[in-house]
């Protein structure tokens, strides 16, 4: 039973969506025309009629009418017609509104959390985006009245879906082409801005002097400094002579190690000056490579 109920609910939702699409796509021109004409008529009434005075006039007219009928009927008939034939119970507005209010209250904490994060700049990027959006809305509503915006939105709601559905492929191709052109233009403008600002940045860097060098040395990636060091150490390791490999001898009786016939050679003296010169040369090469990588 639960599965059938869920299936029926899904069908109802799909039918509602299809009805809304059919309404906006003018599948039934008579029904769509009624809604479109009614919305335009309501907007024209809102523009021409002062709603506050209108509702006040309707309210005091109803009260004067019901009071007069009740008084006259009690005076001549002995019983008030309004109290006799009027509704005895009020419509259950609270029961109708309560589910919607409960659903809205469930979503309220999430909305409050988003507002708190935005106001207190937990993510500054999102805060700036929201500020820019509110600024644009402020300018937009200062240029146009609310009635004009609602009137244009109503016309677009009943015309744009039908136009897009009729020329979908052409509109999609045009939008994709416009996006590509905008990307190219933004890249060109960014490159132009970089080229124009480069001389000023170079001047600032030259004026700062050692401060800019210090910042570069701190912000340089580790890989750029590790590369020359490993290369120089590998060069130093290549310059150092390796010890000769010892010959492997088998334990068989046929192959025996030869007895040395000559006297052992004397040990060579260790020259400290040559070693210090080599170390100085290697450090100079390392400094040159580091300067080239930083430049």
UniProtKB/Swiss-Prot annotation:
Sequence segments annotated as region (Disordered): 219-295
Subunit-level organization: Interacts with POM33.
PANTHER family recorded: RETICULON (PTHR10994), RETICULON-LIKE PROTEIN (PTHR10994:SF193)
Keyword terms, alphabetized: Coiled coil, Endoplasmic reticulum, Membrane, Phosphoprotein, Transmembrane, Transmembrane helix
Polar residues bias spans: 219-235
Descriptive protein name: Reticulon-like protein 1
GO cellular component: a single term: endoplasmic reticulum tubular network
Lumenal compartment residues: 74-142
Entry annotated with the keyword Endoplasmic reticulum: yes
Lineage start: Eukaryota, Fungi, Dikarya, Ascomycota, Saccharomycotina
Positions of post-translational Phosphoserine modification: 232
Cytoplasmic topological domain residue ranges: 1-50, 164-295
Main location: endoplasmic reticulum
Subcellular location: Endoplasmic reticulum membrane
Membrane-spanning intervals of the chain: 51-73, 143-163
């Amino acid at each position: 039973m639960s599965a059938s109920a869920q299936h029926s609910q899904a069908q109802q939702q799909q039918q509602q969506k299809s009805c809304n699409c059919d309404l906006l796509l003018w599948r039934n021109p008579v029904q769509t025309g009624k809604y479109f004409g009614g919305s335009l008529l309501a907007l024209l009434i809102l523009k021409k009629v002062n709603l506050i005075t209108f509702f006040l006039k309707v309210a005091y007219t109803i009260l004067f009418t019901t009071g007069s009928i009740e008084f006259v009927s009690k005076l001549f008939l002995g019983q008030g017609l309004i109290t006799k034939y009027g509704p005895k119970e009020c419509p259950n507005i609270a029961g109708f509104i309560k589910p919607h209010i409960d659903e809205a209250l469930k979503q309220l904490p999430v909305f409050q959390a988003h507002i708190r994060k935005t106001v207190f700049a937990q993510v500054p990027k999102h805060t700036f985006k929201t500020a820019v959006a509110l600024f644009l809305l402020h300018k937009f509503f200062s240029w146009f009245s609310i009635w004009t915006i609602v009137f244009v939105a109503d016309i677009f709601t009943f015309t744009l879906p039908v136009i897009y559905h009729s020329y979908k492929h052409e509109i999609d191709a045009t939008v994709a082409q416009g996006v590509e052109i905008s990307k190219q233009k933004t890249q060109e403008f960014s490159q132009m801005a970089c080229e124009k600002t480069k001389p000023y940045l170079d001047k600032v860097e030259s004026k700062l002097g050692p401060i800019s060098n210090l910042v570069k040395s701190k912000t340089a990636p580790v890989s750029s400094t590790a590369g020359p060091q490993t290369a120089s150490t590998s060069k130093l390791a290549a310059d150092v002579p390796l010890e000769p490999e010892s010959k492997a001898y088998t334990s068989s009786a046929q192959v025996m190690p030869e007895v040395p016939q000559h006297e052992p050679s004397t040990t060579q003296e260790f020259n400290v000056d040559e070693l210090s010169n080599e170390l100085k040369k290697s450090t100079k090469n390392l400094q040159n490579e580091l300067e080239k990588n930083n430049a």
